[in-house]
Swiss-Prot record:
It catalyses: Ca(2+)(in) = Ca(2+)(out). InterPro entries: Ankyrin_rpt, Ankyrin_rpt-contain_sf, Ion_trans_dom, TRPV, TrpV1-4, TrpV4. The lineage of its organism: Eukaryota, Metazoa, Chordata, Craniata, Vertebrata. It comes from Gallus gallus. One of its GO terms (biological process) is actin filament organization. Keywords: ANK repeat, ATP-binding, Calcium, Calcium channel, Calcium transport, Calmodulin-binding, Cell junction, Cell membrane, Ion channel, Ion transport, Lipid-binding, Membrane, Metal-binding, Nucleotide-binding, Repeat, Transmembrane, Transmembrane helix, Transport. This is Transient receptor potential cation channel subfamily V member 4. Residues 652-671 dip into the membrane without crossing it. Homotetramer. Interacts with Ca(2+)-calmodulin. The gene is TRPV4. ANK repeats lie at residues 223-252, 270-299, 355-387. Gene3D superfamilies: 1.10.287.70, Ankyrin repeat-containing domain.
Length: 852
């Protein structure tokens, strides 16, 4: 009998028919099968391995090709196995047991297995050939999501064997086109994912490195986003450097719906470019790397699909909070200075977007007061880029200094759209009254008022009143006999003719001046028509009525009188426009505007519905009037009853007037006698009076009181805005040469340009005092405070025109006065026409006094 432990007949096992098929299961085990060097596991381990094998590959080796939905729904795979070629049904991974004919046969086989080997017999079976692992999108995405580099073993062999790449459609997310690289970047652990370098190495070996790195999202929501965008958003500089070194596109544009402004349905607009994303997320270290790396540098002058540069993007994300304004302004200066050093011939701040807006104009249009104030008051001490400053100190003496503000883009003198016009004429800017109080805007408006605004305004008041008096006289003393046009024979007739000509000319003048403002420049929306452009709209209607009146008069139509009286009423109402010149009456006109276009409009809309509904019901209760046939020819004195005794064809319109009289308490109930059901008629009338006279009228009074209260609280700001509008209206009415004559400011040489030539700019001077920072004024132009003749800077001698000679004599008394009661905080007080009390009131949040 053979020795049970003698393995001599081991060679016969391979050819034995009773060889168990379950012993081949170890060929498919990857992670759980020990290496040959490891000791063999006992029977419990083998049983556990079979159990795990069933759980791992449950459903993985079904007959036939897998269904697509099964691949999509699969999420976790412990091991990846390539299905072998079509096999027989018994070639299964599951252990169904060994086929045995008789128990003794099994016993005999076991004794032969352990017999001692015989010399020259066949050795053990060689190691099985390596099995190629299979990878698909769910498996690959799961591996990179877990950050398991071991799971990527065999991926390169699989791709090379099947001639595939990681950018193929089978490895992309169907809905977004996302590859495994963005998936890995979106699943970082402590800022790292060890599968990313392996994926890049595999892509490089398969020959599609750039395509793999720059593969964008293709869905509508995230279209254009690349792995570089995600690495920047995740604030991973090491991966940003790795991607750029491998060839990432530093100018890729993310244009999906998610990356659009909020008012267009988006969530976060950052300017589409990777550099803009780094700037808008406050990552200066990445900004420095993208613009200074030795592989591919990002161009600071690059614009997105809207034409916005990185500076526009910073303005777009500003929200006027302290934290946001602090980092936005710091990043803004960083990029501006960096661009000036990298591209000396380009002023990044002067580039316009597709809407024709610079970053400064965009800040004004969107009401970003924090970044707006920073731009117009920017002062740079670095001599190499000092030409980027918009504020220059002319002289300083202790806490007092005189500053020169660059007026480029602020006040363009009609040559192009200015920031001042954007602030005044754009009603969508909710905080524009605050932005108008920022220096030098505030002092600039005062200077315009002193130079030409006040005189022109009062001349306009007198001229308009004279024109309206003439219009009233020609309407009152018009001829009563004969059809128009009336003859001109006497001196009075010729005076009337002169008055008619003057009235017609004023109508034509108002027509052309206001049609330009309404439909070309000032009023882009309906709200602007009825709020900011209310008087322009009324003047336009008045001019149309005057022109129509003249046409009907010359055409011999007597109905010209009906049109003329409407024009006369509207003309006198338009005189309220000139109440803007004084604070006392200016606030009153604003109250009237808001009540008319807000409260009264809503009241009339509801009241009209009530009146039509009740009139229809009440008229239906009246008995119809008898027809004219009821009076026979024998009754010559027969008279037909009419309203209010009965209902005829004119009853509805007459009844509407009666209901209005009831609303104001002047009506009667004569029609009650002719009602078919007097009780129902009385009930309807009582409910109508309650709803209109008691409810609606009192609601109107309450709303009007609320509006008056709101206007009173903001009367200073609202009136100042109207005052600024009046100044610009007067300036825009001047021809271009007069605008240049009355332009505020002075031409000053503030230093040297980038090419070494004198940097001459049109600046506006504002005297200020700062009690916290003394002797810290860098870059002062003039050594002698208050000197107005000449000054030296960079070796150039310049003459300053139109500089006030008595400036120093007015500054010193103000400083002495301020020194009596000065707060300890950092206070900058403009020393123009603004008083000391106004400066303190602004600092403590109170309403300052009138600038006039």
């Amino acid at each position: 009998m053979a020795d049970p432990e003698d393995p001599r007949d081991a060679g016969d096992v391979l050819g034995d028919d009773s060889f168990p098929l379950s012993s081949l299961a170890n060929l498919f085990e990857v992670e759980d099968t020990p290496s040959p060097a490891e000791p063999s596991r006992g029977p419990p381990g083998a049983v556990d391995g079979k159990q795990n094998l069933r759980m791992k590959f449950h459903g993985a080796f079904r007959k036939g090709p897998p269904k697509p939905m099964e691949l999509l729904e699969s999420t976790i795979y412990e091991s990846s196995v390539v299905p072998a070629p079509k096999k027989a049904p018994m070639d299964s991974l599951f252990d169904y047991g060994t086929y045995r004919q008789h128990p003794s046969e099994n016993k005999r086989w076991r004794r032969r297995v352990v017999e001692k080997p015989v010399a020259g017999t066949k050795g053990p079976a060689p190691n099985p050939p390596p099995i190629l692992k299979v990878f698909n999108r769910p498996i690959l995405f799961d591996i990179v999501s877990r950050g398991s580099p071991d799971g990527l073993e065999g991926l390169l062999s699989f791709l090379l064997t099947h001639k595939k790449r990681l950018t193929d459609e089978e490895f992309r997310e169907p809905s977004t086109g996302k590859t495994c690289l963005p998936k890995a970047l979106l699943n970082l652990s402590a800022g790292r994912n060890d599968t990313i370098p392996i994926l890049l190495d595999i892509a490089e070996k398969t020959g599609n490195m750039r395509e793999f790195i720059n593969s964008p999202f293709r869905d509508v929501y995230y279209r254009g986003q690349t792995a570089l965008h995600i690495a920047i958003e995740r604030r991973c500089k090491h991966y940003v450097e790795l991607l750029v070194e491998k060839g990432a596109d530093v100018h890729a544009q993310a244009r999906g719906r998610f990356f659009q402004p909020k008012d267009e349905g988006g969530y976060f607009y950052f300017g589409e470019l990777p550099l803009s994303l780094a700037a808008c997320t406050n990552q200066p270290h990445i900004v420095h790397y993208l613009t200074e790396n030795g592989h591919k540098q990002a161009d600071l002058r690059r614009q997105d699909s809207r034409g916005n540069t990185v500076l526009h993007a910073l303005v777009a994300i500003a929200d006027n909070t302290r934290e946001n304004t602090k980092f936005v302004t710091k990043m803004y200066d960083l990029l501006l200075i960096k661009c000036a050093k990298l591209f000396p011939d380009t002023n990044l701040e002067a580039l316009l977007n597709n809407d024709g807006l610079s970053p400064l104009m965009m800040a004004a249009k969107t009401g970003k007061i924090g970044i707006f104030q920073h731009i117009i008051r920017r002062e740079i001490a670095d001599e190499d880029v000092r030409h980027l400053s918009r504020k220059f100190k002319d002289w300083a003496y202790g806490p007092v200094y005189s500053s020169l503000y660059d007026l480029s883009s602020l006040d363009t003198c009609g040559e192009e759209v200015s920031v001042l016009e954007i602030l005044v004429y754009n009603s969508k800017i909710e905080n524009r009254h605050e932005m108008l109080a920022v220096e030098p805007i505030n002092e600039l408006l005062r200077d315009k008022w002193r130079k030409f605004g006040a005189v022109s305004f009062y001349i306009s008041v007198v001229s308009y009143l004279c024109a309206m008096i003439i219009f009233t006289l020609i309407a009152y003393y018009r001829p009563m006999e004969g059809p128009p046009p009336y003859p001109y024979t006497t001196t009075i007739d010729y005076l009337r003719l002169a008055g008619e000509i003057i009235t017609l000319l004023t109508g034509i003048l108002f027509f052309f001046s206001n049609i330009k403002d309404l439909f070309m420049k000032k009023c882009p929306g309906v709200n602007s028509f009825f709020i900011d452009g209310s008087f322009q709209l009324l003047y336009f209607i008045y001019s149309v009525l005057v022109i129509v009146t003249a046409g009907l008069y010359l055409g011999g139509v007597e109905a010209y009188l009906a049109v003329m009286v409407f024009a006369l009423v509207l003309g006198w109402m338009n005189a309220l426009y000139f109440t803007r010149g004084l604070k006392l009456t200016g606030t009153y006109s604003i109250m009237i505007q808001k009540i008319l276009f807000k409260d009264l409009f809503r009241f009339l809309l509801v009241y009209l519905l009530f009146m039509i509904g009740y009139a229809s019901a009440l008229v239906s209760l009246l008995n119809p009037c008898p027809s004219s046939e009821s009076c026979s020819e024998d009754h010559s004195n027969c008279t037909l009853p009419t309203y209010p005794s009965c209902r005829d064809s004119q009853t509805f319109s007459t009844f509407l007037l009666d209901l209005f009289k009831l609303t104001i308490g002047m009506g009667d109930l004569e029609m009650l006698e002719s009602a078919k059901y007097p009780g129902v008629f009385i009930i309807l009338l009582v409910t109508y009076i309650i709803l209109t006279f008691v409810l609606l009228l009192n609601m109107l009074i309450a709303l009007m009181g609320e509006t008056v209260g709101q206007v009173s609280k903001e009367s200073k700001h609202i009136w100042k805005l109207q005052w600024a509008t009046t100044i610009l209206d007067i300036e825009r009415s001047f021809p271009l040469f007069l605008r240049r004559v009355f332009r505020s400011g002075e031409m000053v040489t503030v230093g040297k340009g980038t090419d070494g030539t004198p940097d001459r700019r049109w600046c506006f001077r504002v005297d200020e005092v700062n009690w916290s920072h003394w002797n810290q004024n860098l870059g002062i132009i003039s050594e002698d405070p208050g000197k107005s003749d000449t000054y030296q800077y960079y070796g150039f001698s310049h003459t300053v025109g139109r500089l006030r000679r008595d400036r120093w004599s007015t500054v010193v008394p103000r400083v002495v006065e301020l020194n009596k009661s000065c707060p300890t905080e950092d206070v900058v007080v403009p020393l123009g026409t603004m008083g000391t009390a106004e400066a303190r009131e602004r600092r403590h949040g109170q309403t300052p006094s009138s600038p006039l």
